[in-house]
Amino acid sequence: TVTVTIPSSTIPGNYILISRANSNNVVVESNTTNNLGFSLLNVFTPPITDLTVANVMIPDTVMLGYTMDTARWVIANLSAEEARGYTSDGIYLSAGNLFDSTATLIGIKNKNINLQPLRTDTVKLAPLVTGVVEGNYSVFVKTDLLNQLSESDKDNNTGISATPVYVKVKELPLNVNELNTLHTISRYYKLRIPDSLYGSTILVTLKSNDSLTMKNEMFIAGGYVPTPANYDYGYEIPNYGNQQIVMSDVTDSVYYIMVRCVSPNPLVQNITLKAVKLPFAILNVHTNSGGNIGNVTVRIRGSLYRDSMVAKLSNGTTTIYASAVYFTNSTQVFATFPLQGRPLGVY
């Protein structure tokens, strides 16, 4: 059985409904000329109804990146005709009390409706809350979102919650391991920076129990919720499960963190997030080898670097000073070491 929706723009009249078996030719057949079926179909204009939305009921708080538990609203048929067909209700978050272009669509409830005259029906949905910042929001519900039903009045299709919902972001405390799971839904966190740490360097790490096969990404923004297209700091290593971000000279009181998995058909991961204040430190070195027939330039990532810093290699008996140190910022420098004729070994 296949259910199809006849477009509302279809002109009433008599039609032939054509169906075809094995339409994508996946099954090998000896004869494909008998795969078509035909049926006469009469399309008529449905009676005009009038739907309204009332009693939008919502929780008082919801976490960003989690589902709302649970939104409910009442659809009423104010007409003398039966409202019948396939329709969609949309649920929106609005920072004000107006339903306009600034409202964010967070969920759509698709349903078959068969509502008798002057009757009501309660609809519920647990939408995923994304695309907004922290704060209070009015919740709007618009019925027949795609204009699939004929109605006498489309201006009364929207209802608003009596009280707002507060969208919160889960907090990531400094120096605390935050355990969570990561699958197909992005996770969001809020990192508070006290006044005493303004100007510091903060390291945020993401560790996965499946770092070699999963592909994770992390984005951070100061004062607003980041997206993959809009952020202040981004992950370092593509196609890898573990990620880290070094934020130098932090100046915002709140940073928002977005973590997502971009692997196709991913498994549920156990992840650990942690944010720490970095002292002067070397986090990693690229490249980590070089021949003793000339110069080698390496990238050194870390924290609290200065333009006047010195870099050297040492193995306990031999010290090799960098001939040049190229300062990029307080988290990265490039150092060139003259290795011509130097003893082999680990430094």
List where the protein language model places each region.
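Extracellular/luminal regions of secreted and cell-surface proteins that mediate adhesion/ECM remodeling
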Residues: 1-196, 211, 252-254, 262-277, ...
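A short glycine/threonine-centered beta-strand motif
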Residues: 75-76, 93, 294-306
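Beta-strand signatures of extracellular beta-sandwich domains
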Residues: 88-92, 140, 205, 217-221, ...
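Noncatalytic accessory or regulatory domains flanking protease catalytic cores in secreted, cell-surface
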Residues: 110, 219-272, 330-346
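A structural motif
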Residues: 141, 290, 296-301, 311, ...
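Short proline/glycine-enriched turn/loop motifs at strand-loop junctions of beta-rich domains
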Residues: 197, 210-214, 303-308
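A short beta-strand element within beta-rich, extracytoplasmic domains
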Residues: 200-209
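Ser/Thr/Gly-rich low-complexity blocks that favor extended beta-strand/coil architectures
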Residues: 302-305, 313-320
